[in-house]
Amino acid sequence: MSSVTAVDADGRLPLSSMLATVDALLPLSLLEAVRDVDTPEGVLEAEFVDELRNKRLGLSDTVYTQIKRYSEAVRRNQRTAQDEAIALARLIGRRPDAEAVLRAAGRFLAHEAYMTISPPTRGMLRVLPSFVSRPLALRKVRSIARRYLNGNVRRVGTYVLLEIPRSITVGVAAGGAGCAFYEATLRELLKLLVGTTGAVEHTRCEGRGEGSCEWRADWRGAERAAERSQAA
């Protein structure tokens, strides 16, 4: 097993350490997505299941073992080498369904990170007026992005900007599909925190030679659309 690093509850480490490692939830999310996508629906014959294990990566003993390993690291609040996550992302990037798997991984990470927020706080985010809940939600997005994505979040007007100084998925799949992981994470996280999400745009991409990757989410757009619909 590769070395792991323990962190505090807020995931606070020096920036150099943060960029050299990732929270174990990140590689776990990639593997859980592979397993989920590769698992067929319904009850199957035992012989067919054995055959699938040989053909589908997500059902292999290797993936099962690695999921157990990363799950234990998550339980222990540990980080692992970023190169491991990059290797997993590249492996997924060779699949024809790479974008779908990466989006599923992003949603998984967002949900698991959201569940680390205390139930009372999650409840307050749902019932408090937006002028109170939005700043609280933004603080949670910042904390989650820093800990689980090695990312930086800031607000500009009605937009939330997520910057990833070193993406683990950039260039892993054709057509920039690798970046779908972070887009899906941000979209799902905002949906869970504030109930609605407007458009999420990939405004800057490392793969296009534009420096670090950046996404812009209009987290008030969907809310305004819902208000107009109710008024009509």
Q: What is the predicted role of each segment?
A:
Residues G178-L193:
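Short, non-transmembrane amphipathic alpha-helical segments
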Residues M1-Y159, I168-A177, E206-E210, E223-A232:
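N-terminal accessory segment detector
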Residues D61, T197-V200:
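Short, surface-exposed acidic
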Residues P119, C179-F181, W215-A217:
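General N-terminal targeting signals
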Residues R142-L149, L190-G198:
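Short secondary-structure junctions
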Residues A199-W219:
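Beta-rich nucleic-acid/ligand-interaction surfaces
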